[in-house]
């Protein structure tokens, strides 16, 4: 049975290291564990999960899923690309799907360079600082858009 809603959950550089990298900041769950938790929490949604260390691969994935059609939106943790990738910003701006920017940590309580996001202005919203729940809130935000 085909789900009525399909979402892409996309993660950028270094998020493949979750569970190992700075667990006091990012938590102890791996990215696979986070993805499984999202799928379990929202069984009515068909998810595609994607992670890359490479900016171009993230951009290509956005364009690919838009070209395929059938996706209702994207939950995006761009990692460090959040702070400097004009190319990713332009790609988000170029697609018609809504994108929610999410972060595990509260970036505004961290180093100054993390306070600026170049992608926020082209996303429908930003969720940060709630750990794994940031992803769940991002999914809920996209699902709620159908009620507006």
Curated annotation (Swiss-Prot):
Could you say which residues are annotated as the site Transition state stabilizer? 21
Gene Ontology BP annotations: amino acid biosynthetic process; aromatic amino acid family biosynthetic process; chorismate biosynthetic process; quinate catabolic process
Q: Which Gene3D superfamilies match?
A: Dehydroquinase, class II (3.40.50.9100)
> What residues does substrate bind to?
77, 83, 90, 104-105, 114
- EC numbers: 4.2.1.10
Could you tell me which pathway this protein works in? Metabolic intermediate biosynthesis; chorismate biosynthesis; chorismate from D-erythrose 4-phosphate and phosphoenolpyruvate: step 3/7
Please name the GO terms that the record assigns under molecular function. 3-dehydroquinate dehydratase activity
InterPro entries given in the database record: DHquinase_II, DHquinase_II_CS, DHquinase_II_sf
Name the enzyme's class. lyase
Catalytic residues? 26, 103
**Keyword annotations from UniProtKB, A to Z:** Amino-acid biosynthesis, Aromatic amino acid biosynthesis, Lyase
Substrates-to-products reaction catalysed: 3-dehydroquinate = 3-dehydroshikimate + H2O
Concerning NCBIfam families, the annotation shows: aroQ (TIGR01088), PRK05395.1-2 (NF003805), PRK05395.1-4 (NF003807)
Record function comment: Catalyzes a trans-dehydration via an enolate intermediate.
Complex formation: Homododecamer.
The Swiss-Prot or TrEMBL record describes its family as follows: Belongs to the type-II 3-dehydroquinase family.
What is this protein's name? Answer: 3-dehydroquinate dehydratase
Species name: Chlorobaculum tepidum (strain ATCC 49652 / DSM 12025 / NBRC 103806 / TLS) (Chlorobium tepidum)
Give the gene that encodes this protein. Answer: aroQ
């Amino acid at each position: 049975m085909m789900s009525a809603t399909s979402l892409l959950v996309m993660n950028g550089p270094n998020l493949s290291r979750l569970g190992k990298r700075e667990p006091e900041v990012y938590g102890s769950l791996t990215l696979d564990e986070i993805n499984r938790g999202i799928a379990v929490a929202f069984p009515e949604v068909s998810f595609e999960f994607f992670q890359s260390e490479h900016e171009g691969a993230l951009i290509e994935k956005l364009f690919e899923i838009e070209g395929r059609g059938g996706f209702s939106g994207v939950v995006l943790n761009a990692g460090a690309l959040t702070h400097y990738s004009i190319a990713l910003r332009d790609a988000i701006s170029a697609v018609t799907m809504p994108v929610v920017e999410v972060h595990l940590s509260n970036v505004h309580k961290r180093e100054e360079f993390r306070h600026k996001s170049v992608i926020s202005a082209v996303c429908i919203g930003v969720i940060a600082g709630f750990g794994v729940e940031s992803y769940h809130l991002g999914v809920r935000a996209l699902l709620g858009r159908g009620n507006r």
